[in-house]
């Protein structure tokens, strides 16, 4: 009876048991991805995140192609397969950990396994989906609302005391509408910068290559396609300036 109970527990918590076993490999893979992401930057911070940066997976694939050109190696093939499996599981797990019923555990996993550069006093609420967390910075006192999507593949920098309301979407990559297969385009990707004390209302969407200035307010439901001035209030689709916020 005890054995059956133990088997049931293993089945219920199987995802988390696999995660615990793979914690170290997951951190190593994310560390490699972060190094690749920052490879062409002048420094090792995200303060200049508006620069166009290569995606980590593309760099890894390019490296593998160069190695393959030099000849076949079973060890190299196995290494590549293992890396791809762990990398894929990492992308899967970060989508499932968002539902773990513990704010403390979620933030610990984001910071130390997926290498999200988040301040201890920042808050990431239930259901937030983070992509490429190793290229995401969240400053002191900032709040990420429930069910937000932070697509940090090209880098996202969120300053201090920023408020992202529920279901805010930040997209650093998009598709080319003129391409017959809607493939990605270098002109449709770029980092997003959100200055300190900015407030993004519920269901705001911010597209690639956008800088939202300090203290700016983006009204609920807006779609931001261009830079927003500091302390400006913008609204609409596409977002346009409708006023200014007090600087006091």
Where are these regions (language model features)?
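A generic "structured core" feature
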Residues: 208, 217-219, 223
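Acidic, glycine-centered active-site loop in nucleotide-sugar glycosyltransferases
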Residues: 229-230, 235-238
């Amino acid at each position: 009876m005890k054995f059956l109970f133990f088997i049931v527990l293993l089945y219920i918590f199987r995802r988390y048991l696999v995660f615990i076993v793979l914690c170290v490999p997951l951190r190593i893979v994310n560390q490699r991805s972060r190094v690749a992401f920052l490879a062409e930057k002048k420094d090792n911070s995200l303060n200049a995140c508006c620069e166009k940066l290569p995606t980590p997976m593309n760099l890894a694939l390019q490296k593998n192609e160069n190695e393959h050109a030099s000849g076949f190696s079973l060890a190299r093939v196995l290494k590549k397969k293992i890396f791809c499996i762990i990398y894929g599981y990492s992308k899967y797990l970060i989508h499932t950990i968002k539902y773990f019923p513990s704010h403390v555990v979620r933030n610990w996993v984001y910071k130390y396994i997926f290498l999200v550069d988040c301040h201890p006093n920042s808050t990431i609420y239930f259901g937030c989906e983070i992509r490429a967390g190793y290229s995401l910075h969240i400053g002191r006192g900032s709040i990420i609302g429930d069910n937000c999507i932070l697509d940090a593949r090209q880098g996202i920098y969120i300053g201090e005391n920023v408020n992202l309301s529920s279901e805010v979407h930040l997209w650093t990559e998009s598709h080319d509408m003129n391409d017959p297969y809607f493939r990605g385009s270098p002109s449709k990707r770029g980092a997003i910068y959100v200055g300190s004390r900015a407030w993004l209302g519920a269901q705001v969407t911010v597209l690639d290559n956008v800088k939202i200035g300090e203290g700016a307010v983006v009204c609920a439901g807006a779609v931001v396609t261009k830079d927003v001035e500091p302390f400006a209030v913008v609204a609409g689709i596409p977002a346009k300036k409708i006023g200014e916020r007090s600087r006091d």
